[in-house]
Regions:
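C-terminal alpha-helical "lid/dimerization" subdomain adjacent to the S-adenosyl-L-methionine
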Residues: 233-288, 293-295
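Conserved SAM-binding loop
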Residues: 168-169
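A short SAM/SAH-binding and catalytic strip from SAM-dependent methyltransferases
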Residues: 198-213
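A short glycine-rich, Lys/Arg-flanked "PGG" loop and its adjoining helix->strand segment in the class I
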Residues: 215-228
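Class I SAM-dependent methyltransferase Rossmann-like catalytic core
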Residues: 61-126
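A short acidic, Gly/Pro-enriched loop at the edge of an enzyme's catalytic core
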Residues: 189-200
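Conserved SAM-binding loop of SAM-dependent methyltransferases across substrates and taxa
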Residues: 137-152
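Conserved SAM/SAH-binding beta-strand->alpha-helix loop
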Residues: 161-163
Length: 312
């Protein structure tokens, strides 16, 4: 890597904890599976899915690489986030893996959200634009755009996970964009973007942060990093009907939602549960200073995209 593109840490003495997939558990895989089994038995049937069926789901899930990672970490890292979005297996280990990649509502909403981001970001490409992704993960949101007419764009990826930045650099090299990319290892809440960005794109961080004030503060960081007239493209996860009467979810299959609940809540213990409504998200963005806020829903209204602008 060149000096301008290799990851560097702007806060080496104070590295905050990864929200998405950090784990301090010393449990072995077998110990974790046993603990989940006990929880399933104690919790009982769920919406037509018997304890025996849930235990069979756990067994099938524990044989998948994705399943083993989620059982340990309870959230997705950069590699597995990109895998869920982009991977199209030609062979499935078992029927559960096929359901996860082709039918699970949250996965389909995530893929649709990614496609919406790609369309919007492509439209925002301009000569000499500075585009920032935070947290960038493998940075597919920016690195998979078409830069045929915009080879002068500057791309900046910011993440707290060193492995994510390494994978982002690999993808940049594959795309022939290694000379346009800069990577920074730091916490999203502490970055100083020096009012340099034309576009900031952010996905997958607010869903792990339960504190509304901290999320609003994150939006303030983004606002301060944008040039006047700059644009933020972000997203959020809406609450399911089981948690809120204000849930906007539509076009969902009840059986698949029940399966998803068992996987996420009883088996994985998922940490991406910081759900917010459209109204709450709009309020947070307005508090941060953004105007002209627009929402684009996926067809299930699970994972909306938000476009927000910094006024001139």
């Amino acid at each position: 890597m060149s000096d301008s593109s290799k990851p560097h840490n702007s806060s080496p003495n104070n590295v905050p904890r990864l929200l998405s997939h950090a784990t301090s558990s010393q449990e072995s895989h077998d110990e974790r599976v046993t603990a989940v089994k006990d929880n399933i038995i104690e919790s009982g049937d769920h919406l037509g899915i018997s304890v025996e069926e849930q235990l069979a789901l756990l067994d099938a899930f524990s044989h998948l690489e994705l399943g083993q990672f989620l059982l340990k970490h309870h959230g997705l890292n950069a590699h597995w986030t990109h895998n869920v979005i982009a991977h199209r297996p030609t062979h499935y280990i078992n029927s559960l893996e096929e359901i996860i990649y082709t039918q699970l509502p949250n996965v389909l909403a995530t893929r649709e959200r990614f496609g919406i981001f790609q369309r919007l970001l492509q439209e925002l490409l301009r000569p000499d634009a500075v585009m920032i992704s935070v947290p960038c993960g493998v940075m597919a949101d920016l690195l998979l755009l078409d830069y045929t007419r915009h080879r002068d764009v500057k791309l900046i990826g910011i993440d707290l996970d060193k492995q994510a930045l390494e994978e982002a650099y690999k993808l940049a090299s594959q795309q022939g964009l290694e000379n346009q990319i800069s990577l920074v290892l730091t916490d999203a809440w502490t970055i100083d973007l020096a009012v340099q960005a034309d576009v900031i794109t952010s996905n997958g961080l607010n869903v792990y942060e339960q504190d509304d004030d901290k999320v609003t503060e994150l939006y303030r960081v983004f606002y301060s990093g944008l040039k006047p007239g700059g644009t933020l493209i972000t997203s959020f996860m809406t609450p399911p009907p089981t948690l809120s009467q204000d849930s906007p979810w539509i076009n969902t299959d009840p059986k698949l939602l029940a399966l998803q609940y068992v996987l996420f809540s009883r088996i994985i213990g998922a940490t991406w549960t910081a759900f917010r409504t459209h109204q709450k998200t709009q309020s947070q963005l307005e508090q941060a200073g953004f105007t002209d806020i627009q929402f684009i829903n996926d067809h299930m209204h699970m994972y909306p995209t938000v476009i927000a602008n910094k006024p001139f």
